[in-house]
Amino acid sequence: MKNILILLTVLLLPLAADGQDKPSFSAREMADVRVATPGLFAKGNHIYLHLDSLKDHEYAFPLPGGKVISAYGTRGGHSGTDIKTCAKDTIRAAFDGVVRMSKPYYAYGNIVVIRHANGLETLYSHNFKNLVKTGDLVKAGQAIGLTGRTGRATTEHVHFETRINGQHFNPNLIF
């Protein structure tokens, strides 16, 4: 899967933002989620993620050995992918980055959000315990939390989201 060139176009993104998709954040939570460059998703703009140039140690699956129990887009616009293994399994950072948020966060429960150098953000929620704090530098594959059932969760798992400037997209495009 390493030899993948991902092209995100504005032609695909309006499907997730045209009102058919339920917002993943409440109005109160939106104060923490801002689009840094609003014109980024204007018609004709493209974002390229050259994953084929990454070395094996530069990325990691968030929950090795995990099973997808709820895919992106299911259940009325699910904004991420739910991955399950055993309770308190180790959650790993997908890429190098800086922890932007590590705290209890409404329906997400214990959440870790990591901002990566390419503008990508990854989100890991429902954690039993966060192992990193806001401002920490993390490496791909580093332990950042333990799977849990905090917030609005019905079983122990990690809810994994990928976002660029606040706009979520299918994590399967990366992994």
What residue spans do the PLM features occupy?
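A residue-level detector for short acidic-glycine micro-motifs
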Residues: S70, T85, M101, H126-K129, ...
